[in-house]
């Protein structure tokens, strides 16, 4: 039954993903997914309406034991061409402790069944409007959009170093569950149209919350509308004093953040 979600199984950056609400739109969604699939493999799934924000963050297992799990609040730009391309993330998540605990237990069960050992994972989860928790996707690699870096900022847990050490056969240290040190957000800078990049404006009132500004384009560079993660032009890492402060800043981005494109 509809709605459905149609996506490639081997793409990245949320490219080729479409929500389908009626049968007459299915063919176009299938063609779009195939266009972005490397090997021509796609999947059609039930679309699960979410409660709060979905989560997309990184976690780490050591010798098959899930030593560290993180959950984020994944946010989207409803005005972007790619409505399923994450436009911002924040930590902690909008889930409650019971929901996160249930997901952690199920993730551990999954890794045990798959005989996983020592690895970093990009994990997408959500809570449905029915109150049930769902594991949407588990990839045995670090996520894009600097997620492991954001987790290092927000918790101090360094999965990047741990992943490299594991890859070369060295011992892995420092992977343990730690609390979040404040309220963190990552904004994926992007343009809402094709054109030439002109400037990035951040109001003075918000500058004190900016921990890192990473702009990947220069004035005059070509930029494209936000259809996939590959269309991002940079990131903004911010830290706030409260969840309310963070939420207000993300919801009112248009008032203090502007990307000029000619």
Task: Cite the ranges covered by each PLM segment.
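Short, flexible turn/loop "capping" segments at secondary-structure junctions
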Residues: 8-10, 83-84, 226-231
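C-terminal catalytic subdomain
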Residues: 157-164
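Glycine-rich phosphate/pyrophosphate-binding beta-alpha loops
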Residues: 14, 139-155, 218-219
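Phosphate-binding core of ATP-grasp and ATP-grasp-like enzymes
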Residues: 33-41, 48-93, 101-133, 139-147, ...
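Active-site nucleotide/adenylate-binding loops and adjacent lid/helix of ATP-dependent enzymes
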Residues: 1-43, 63, 93-105, 109, ...
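Short, well-ordered beta-strand elements within core beta-sheets of diverse protein domains
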Residues: 18, 46, 91-92, 152, ...
């Amino acid at each position: 039954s509809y709605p459905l979600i149609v996506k490639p199984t081997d793409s990245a950056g949320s490219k080729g993903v479409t929500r389908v609400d009626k049968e007459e739109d299915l063919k176009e969604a299938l063609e779009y997914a195939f266009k972005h699939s490397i090997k021509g493999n796609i999947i059609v799934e039930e679309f699960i309406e979410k409660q709060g924000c979905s989560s997309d963050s990184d976690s780490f297992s050591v010798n098959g034991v899930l030593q560290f799990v993180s959950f984020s609040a994944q946010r989207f730009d409803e005005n972007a061409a790619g409505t399923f391309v994450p436009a911002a993330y924040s930590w902690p998540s909008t889930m409650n402790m019971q929901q996160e605990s249930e997901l952690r237990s199920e993730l551990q069960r999954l890794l045990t069944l798959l005989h996983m050992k020592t690895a970093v994972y990009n994990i997408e989860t959500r809570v449905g409007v029915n109150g049930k928790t769902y594991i949407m996707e588990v990839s045995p690699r670090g996520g894009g959009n600097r997620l492991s870096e954001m987790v290092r900022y927000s918790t101090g847990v360094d999965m990047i170093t741990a992943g490299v050490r594991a890859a070369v056969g060295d011992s892995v240290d420092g992977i343990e569950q730690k609390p979040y040190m404040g309220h963190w957000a990552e904004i994926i800078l992007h343009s809402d149209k094709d054109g030439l990049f002109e400037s990035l404006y951040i109001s003075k009132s918000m500058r004190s919350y900016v921990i890192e500004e990473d702009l990947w384009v220069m004035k005059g560079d070509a930029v494209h509308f936000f259809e996939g993660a590959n269309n991002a032009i940079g990131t903004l890492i911010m830290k706030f004093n409260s969840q309310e402060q963070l939420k207000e800043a993300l919801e009112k981005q248009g008032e203090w953040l502007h990307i000029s494109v000619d």
